[in-house]
Amino acid sequence: MISAVFGKRRSLSRTLTAGTICAALISGYATMASADDGQGATGEAIIHADDHPGNWMTYGRTYSDQRYSPLDQINRSNVGNLKLAWYLDLDTNRGQEGTPLVIDGVMYATTNWSMMKAVDAATGKLLWSYDPRVPGNIADKGCCDTVNRGAAYWNGKVYFGTFDGRLIALDAKTGKLVWSVNTIPPEAELGKQRSYTVDGAPRIAKGRVIIGNGGSEFGARGFVSAFDAETGKVDWRFFTVPNPKNEPDAASDSVLMNKAYQTWSPTGAWTRQGGGGTVWDSIVYDPVADLVYLGVGNGSPWNYKYRSEGKGDNLFLGSIVALKPETGEYVWHFQETPMDQWDFTSDQQIMTLDLPINGETRHVIVHARKNGFFYIIDAKTGEFISGKNYVYVNWASGLDPKTGRPIYNPDALYTLTGKEWYGIPGDLGGHNFAAMAFSPKTGLVYIPAQQVPFLYTNQVGGFTPHPDSWNLGLDMNKVGIPDSPEAKQAFVKDLKGWIVAWDPQKQAEAWRVDHKGPWNGGILATGGDLLFQGLANGEFHAYDATNGSDLFHFAADSGIIAPPVTYLANGKQYVAVEVGWGGIYPFFLGGLARTSGWTVNHSRIIAFSLDGKSGPLPKQNDQGFLPVKPPAQFDSKRTDNGYFQFQTYCAACHGDNAEGAGVLPDLRWSGSIRHEDAFYNVVGRGALTAYGMDRLHGNMNPTEIEDIRQFLIKRANETYQREVDARKNADGIPEQLP
């Protein structure tokens, strides 16, 4: 009990005894201000999470991942009185995607670069902080920012993954290291290519910590691992795609060798690139079915013809796979996108519900996945029940009502036709990692939906991989939007974002809330008939859960992509969210991503209550990277190759066609482009490796790096006056740049 800070609220009971502690020699350190003793949640406590509604004990609050809290002190009648209670500035102004946990008044929040913080949930006072010291050169091994989506809590320990592939257990009271393991075994690496990263939240099931990874864009063979929560010893590992030689190597051996291998070509590029199928987000334990569900990712490479010679369904890409938590043994699977060639992962949030269907209540999985369809699947057997598109789709006309298999639009099979395909949804999906929520009071699922088209174009001349780069099998010179006002205006008209309130019983939309653009935050539903969501334009909103009416908004000054949580501290209800825009949408879409609303990142955690007394957030820079007049001369004979090299190695972080969205440096205005040696010192020699800009000397020669510099000077000259003019409005903030 920690009465000094948390009053007389009853703590969770500790139902498991501490096991063996395994020390690990790993870099990292904790700094501690002061900490009080929160007690340990266990699986039994999480199963009965509603007995402790003031806590947020696991990623989705309960094992069902519904992100619904019964707390109702804050409700429709008084939410307009909500005020900022406290804020805590974070270490880095990059994207923040984490779901904080709150156990007995202590908040455990993971932040960018895999840092962990324990915070007094009533005051925002930092109790301790742990930095695992992720090497800066790991940043370019991941597709979509060095984010972290959250932690797990078990028996007095807090667990989280690091971007360089570790799983760390800390003492929740002190922040001291208990154990640390490398989750990426040597046999998972592809020769010298190590592209695995970890940014998802681990999950706890029956005393095991389960974690996946990402990396399919570079070349990876997906898997999940389960570790003993007390010791860190690996219990089992399940690969999601076969061994290319069809040899045994994990708990997945039997099903991969007997069921999955024949769905792949024996000689496609997957045998060298790993095949993909990384489980980078959704892992759910269901105590009702006693199963662990995995959301399996896209292929590596994306291009189906190159990956598997255009043959087979490629199990278990784009699938939900159910395993036994004790052993990792396969139980069932349902493949949502056979023959994936659009980056239609199944990693999006898996939620379980008890749903009335044809006169009986069935325990089901509901899944609003990237491909634009809302699936209802029997949670115990994997039987397809129904599916309906929740956003506009043009790649399929629907799903087979018996099997759930997509009814493909033949033109969408671009890898087989050899023609370009303007896909909706595009690779970012109708729903991505941003959490959806369910309210048992309304019976609705609330989806942070979006529309971001993508031009799919085959890589010419066959598949040619590039080390430490995206290897999609696409022509990266053509997937970008041309730099013309007409082309950009046409594309911008197709960029959309909404809350879609979906009735799962009717498989129909109930209503929607329109947003300025895509890439908004996750959603929280509460017993006060409220929905909370942060937006890309820096606003934090509360909506009426029955009809979507906007009841409250707050200027957070930075874009929000994280999902909110709610909890009790000293008997008072709070709502909190991590602030900081990032991820692949602003990274790659660059200037076009500003259509969702321009903000400059000032990453922090903010918390609200009905009697908050923090006052407004401090005024900070809101103009971002200012344009600097570039050198006037460039070599036009080198800029075409510079564009190719930039799109291959640089665009995923610094923006399509070298236009940044303000999260990472906009290279058009970098002082280094003025001097050949200065630019090579950064790009070739790695002068800024500690900050996440790894050296590319091993992948490009000095001539190719200089070609990039010439291209950047060209782009700076083409866009300088446009950017200057955009900052001449009353607020000095860039408007949309068509």
Curated annotation (Swiss-Prot):
Its subcellular locations are: Cell membrane
Xref: PROSITE patterns: BACTERIAL_PQQ_1 (PS00363), BACTERIAL_PQQ_2 (PS00364), CYTC (PS51007)
Q: How does it sit in the membrane?
A: Peripheral membrane protein
Which residues does the annotation say bind heme c? 650, 653-654, 693
- Chain positions recorded as Ca(2+) binding sites: 217, 298, 343
What GO annotations for molecular function exist for this entry?
Answer: calcium ion binding; electron transfer activity; heme binding; oxidoreductase activity, acting on CH-OH group of donors
What EC number(s) is this enzyme filed under?
1.1.5.5
- What does the entry comment about cofactor binding? Binds 1 PQQ group per subunit. Binds 1 Ca(2+) ion per subunit.
Which cofactors does this protein require? Answer: pyrroloquinoline quinone; Ca(2+); heme c
The keyword Electron transport belongs to this UniProt entry's keyword annotation: yes
Stated family: Belongs to the bacterial PQQ dehydrogenase family.
Q: What is the protein's name according to its record?
A: Alcohol dehydrogenase (quinone), dehydrogenase subunit
